[in-house]
Amino acid sequence: MMMNKIPEINRARGYFLYTADGKRYLDMALDGGRLIMGHRQKGYGQALKNAIDKGILPSFPSPYAHRLKQAVRSLFGAGCHVYLFKSEEHAKATLASHGLEYTLWRPLAFNTDTASSVTNACDPINDPINHKPSSNMDTQKSTATLELPVIPLLPVPAPFAPGVVVSKSELNIVEEQVSPVILAGAMRAVYNLKAFLAEVDYSCWEKAGITETCKGKWRVELPYLYPLCERNQYPAVWDAFFEAGIILSCDYDTPSVLSPDLSDGNRKKLLKLLAEC
């Protein structure tokens, strides 16, 4: 397996991974695309620590469930219905057991126009439990695009990702209780994502001619890259990038993710590989 070729990682920063002996890898896999904002996002670790320090680690009912739902609605619209599960797999299994189809939502992957502007009054940084969201929260976001239930790919590592289902209409499904620690981290990450989507700029890749560079080899949907090679050819492509210090998605069907802030040198190196492989 491709994942087994990755050496022991000692630390991570931004979009790069570092081994104990100092070797650096550009991470374009980003945990299945979850870490679109890069590693070590602001406030995420502190949110986990704050919840742990309160001693409520088991999956008891807690105010964090409501707070996470509020965060999700700030992206998808105040009128949507939000359901929480222990994991993405539990969410998928629940929908499948009810014969419900769903869409996996990747930030910026298609034109759903779900990202609203940053509303700092809705961002419970200091005290998530006692925070009272502002009545000025953006309530104008349309949920018309939610024709199917949506499972958002939350910007947290998979082991720390609760399952979230977002629907335009009410669903006859039963939620699960989720650890407040998991919910607190996810809530912090969703607000981080909201700010990220309002500010991120991938135009550097357009200016560098990425679409023309990748023509016939990769489908470009900034910031995502989908391989156009045959499935059985993808491991060789992955190996070529890995030898050059770049880790692509380990799954053919899951896109690799471009960094919005690579140096000119790293961008040129990556473009050269994309044109060749």
Task: Kindly label every feature range from the protein language model.
Residues M1-F16, D31, I36, A51, ...:
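Active-site-adjacent loop/helix segments that line or gate small-molecule/cofactor pockets in enzymes
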Residues R106-Y191:
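Active-site PLP attachment segment
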Residues W205-A240, S256-L262:
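Conserved PLP-binding catalytic core of the aspartate aminotransferase-like
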Residues A240-C277:
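PLP-dependent enzyme catalytic core of the Aspartate aminotransferase-like
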Residues I173-E212, E230:
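Structural signature of PLP-dependent enzymes
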Residues Y25-L26, L30-P63, Q70-F76, C80:
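Glycine-rich phosphate-binding segment of PLP-dependent enzymes
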Residues R73-P107:
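Short loop-beta-helix segment that forms the pyridoxal 5′-phosphate
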